[in-house]
Amino acid sequence: MKSNAVLLTALASALLSAAPAVALAQTQAASTTQANELGSPDKEFVQAASMSSSTEIDASKLASKQSQDKDVKNFAHHMMVDHTKLTLQLKMAAPHGVTVPKDNSDTAVLDSLKGLKGKEFDTAYIQKVGVEGHKQAVEAFQKEAQEGQNADLKKAAQKALPTIQQHLKMAQDLAAKKGVQ
């Protein structure tokens, strides 16, 4: 009997000591679920940023094949390297359970470039991908940096914004150098 009482006391003690851990686990699970539910502006940013980077990377691969201009090829290489890094940073900043699309390039932009070669390609690439693409990216990153609800995504946008702004300036300089309007 005495051993049953000791056993019951030990069991009750173990159950009571486990209760806070169970409550903590439930609280953590609830907060993880809340973190996974991004607000609309953050979801839009993840989509826009991943599409921008995917398009930059894919269009820059085209530029490395279809352009004959050294400056355009150098710009394209720079964009491939930087946007690969930016995509990785975005994936690391996204909350657990939020998928950053791997390859969601803007097919309309890519399709408009595929049939072009030489100077015709260079002009379209500089206009659509270099200048216009980076203007849109700057807007998306600025909006997230100012209005984002998810702290990690907001911080990632703030960190990446100077790079995106530098890309826009590089594209504008390249456009001026090549006489692209």
Question: Which functions belong to the PLM regions below?
Answer:
Residues 2-10, 16-181:
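His/Met- and acidic-residue-enriched segments that coordinate or traffic transition-metal cofactors
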